[in-house]
């Protein structure tokens, strides 16, 4: 059975991705920052929940021994964990900038590094980074979020060139406006702005 590690698995896009992998007969390792009944959410025992904060390198190191699947390999990493802290730039607190950049960009560095070492040893694997259309187009009130997601595109392109010769794929997906717990936190103006970018509304 193939295995996948998905960060930010407790809700929204991450949980939907996990369900898709379960349907395709993968064993799912899913992370979140707090306790979560992943088996119940996925209606499957082919999964394991790991409590980890992608900002905490010691926390990541402590779970790596639990990651390899039944063949002592990890076939795929999905970097999905992310946060928003929307605010007009002139009013944005340092902490709102730091928290978003640390989770959405540095957090991906933190977990991808040990996973890529594992994949280099096995000479195979796939890394999928979840960016956002906000990283392509920008959004008012999301300078921090858009910056983190735009930077992730560069991260992906560069890492892909480094790892491709060793048989490891690195790709990035930029979802548009998707109904989720994160988008439910947007103001009506932000929702209207996002919807205005969709030709069919």
What are the roles of these predicted feature ranges?
Residues 132:
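Residue(s) in the substrate-gating loop at a strand-loop-helix junction
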Residues 92, 138-146, 158, 186:
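Active-site loop-to-helix junction immediately N-terminal to the catalytic Tyr of the SDR YXXXK motif
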Residues 112, 148, 156:
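Active-site helix of classical SDR
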Residues 10-11:
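Conserved glycine-rich cofactor-binding loop
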């Amino acid at each position: 059975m193939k295995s996948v590690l998905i960060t930010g698995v407790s809700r929204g896009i991450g949980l939907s991705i996990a369900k898709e992998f379960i349907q395709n007969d993968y064993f799912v390792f899913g992370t979140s920052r707090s306790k979560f009944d992943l088996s119940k959410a996925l209606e499957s025992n082919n999964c394991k929940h790991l409590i980890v904060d992608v900002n905490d390198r010691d926390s990541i190191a402590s779970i790596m021994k639990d990651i390899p699947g039944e063949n002592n390999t990890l076939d795929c990493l999905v970097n999905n964990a992310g946060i928003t802290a929307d605010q007009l730039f002139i009013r944005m607190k340092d902490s709102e900038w730091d928290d978003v950049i640390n989770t959405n960009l540095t957090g991906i560095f933190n977990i991808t590094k040990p996973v890529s070492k594992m994949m280099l040893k096995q000479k195979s694997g796939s890394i999928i980074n979840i960016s956002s259309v906000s990283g392509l187009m920008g959004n008012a009130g999301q300078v921090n979020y858009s910056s983190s997601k735009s930077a992730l595109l560069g991260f992906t392109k560069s890492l892909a060139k480094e790892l491709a010769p060793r048989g490891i794929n690195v790709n990035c997906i930029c979802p548009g406006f998707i109904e989720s717990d994160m988008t439910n936190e947007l103001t009506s103006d932000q929702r209207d702005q996002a919807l205005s970018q969709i030709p069919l509304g």
